[in-house]
Amino acid sequence: MAIYHLSVSNVSRASGSRATATLSYITGKRVHDERRGETYDYGRKERVLRVGTLLPEGAPAEFADPAVLFNAVELHETGRTARPAKKIVVALPREFTPRQRVQALEGYIRENLNADGYAATYAIHDDGQGNNPHAHILVANRQIDPKTGGWAKLKQRMEYVLDERGERVPLIDPKTGAQKLDKRGRRQWKRTSVSLNPLDRKAKLQSLRESWAKTCNARLDETARIDHRSLEDQGSDLEPTIHEGYAARAIERAGGVSERCQTNREIRRSNDLLTAIRHELGRIFDRLGELFAAKIGQLRQRQARPEAAREPNWRYFEGDARRQLEADRADHAAALRGRLMDARADVRNRETWWKNHGTEEFEAAKQIIDVACEASREARDAGMFQRGRLRRNAEQVAGEQSERLRGAVPWLEDTEIPADWDQANRFRMRTTKAIHDHDMQPRTGLVAELERQLEQAEQAAGERPSPEQVKDLALRMAEQRERAEGQARGANRPEPSGDEPLDLSEPEDWGESSPFEQRATPKTKADLLGELKQRADRRTGRQEAEQRQIDPWSAQPPQRRGHGR
């Protein structure tokens, strides 16, 4: 199974590392360091499967020899803390063939390193038995200028150190405890060296990690894809494994137990158990979802049955529904016509009002522009000796009045009053028309919108309602009728009491088991009928007595009233 691994480290002179020594280690070749006069030969050639060097555009041809390349960068970097190279280690998927390994690795180097001006040497390794395939990429830590073929400049710059509030940190004199001052008395601030090398930036390192995952996934099946993100970034709660390393695996191959390998085995068992639990929960939730969907389907079928049973009833209201829809559309169009007439009348009334009046903005703008026009008229009509002075005065007045106009009419776009009399008069006409149009725009806009709505309403009124609309309204009318009938039946139903009128007539045939026999009472049928008749007689007597109390004449025979002697 393919795994993801990519690590980047510095070849730092401060920690005793050398680019030439690292080159000898990854290539398994003998390398001479020209700067120090030392020769490195780490051997282990049996683990090295392939070595290659890829150069950017404009690089010298002799840099194709990795020993020449990294001796050159060692000689160019003279600082005691210099970092002449970077080392990138990537895990190669076991699913790759030897040719795919080379293609993926060289494509990755060209796209991410050579394209930015970096030269690099790679070496493909395994453990000597075909396991643990991986690659070392040694990158010269300075870009090559494509124009000159030499090393690029400006690797770093100085920047101020900032505190947590984003403010500069003062440089304190340890003797006095005060902030240091330079020779001119200026305060000193802490500064630090910031690398301008893209390989030292976090964004570039993230890009390298993501690009390696994409390069491998382009050649892997979907079931063997790798992900450059951490488990936390992926939103997974699985525990990540730790790096085992060559020494730990060597202990395991020798029959021992490595602490790192044992830790990873426990982590994998825990992750496998968690994955199995999650898979089982997913299967249970899927089954619950299927059952829920089935129940929803049954409920919908039950809800659809009353609609299907009511289908024949809506036909009775089909004609009424169609006429109602047509009437509603006609009423809507008529209402829009009335609103449109009112809106047009409002526009005419406002236009009439404008002939004799004006808004505050209108009057203010006229007064402001008239002042500028008067100054420009005086300049135009002035004599030869005063014309220059009055023209300058007209320009000054036009500028001042333009400022006043911007304050009086803030929404007006063109507020620059010309100093020329003819242009100022034309500006006056344009401005007053703009104020008039701005005041009328809500009313004319309402008229246009009502005209559009009326056109749509008249078009809809001229069309027949669709069958779906007719059926929907007819169904609602049928439902409303059924609810009204149900309420009427409930209102007319008498309340149950002991004095309900009884049907005393005996059915022609009770059948084998009459209602009286089903009660299993000891009384006979004749006894029960007698009791029921007595109960009815008592109730009839009570009703007659109540009637006599209300109207005493109702119980006596009617008497003739006349003028007898």
Swiss-Prot record:
Tagged with keyword Hydrolase: no
Composition skew (Basic and acidic residues), residue ranges: 524-549
Biased composition (Acidic residues): 497-511
UniProt source species: Bifidobacterium longum (strain NCC 2705)
Family to which the UniProt record says this protein belongs: Belongs to the MobA/MobL family.
Region (Disordered), start-end ranges: 479-565
Any Pfam family: MobA_MobL
Name of the molecule in the record: Probable mobilization protein MobA
Keyword Repressor appears in the UniProt entry: no
Record's keyword terms, sorted: Conjugation, Mobility protein, Plasmid
Function: Might be involved in plasmid transfer.
Matching InterPro entries: MobA_MobL (IPR005053)
Organism domain of life: Bacteria
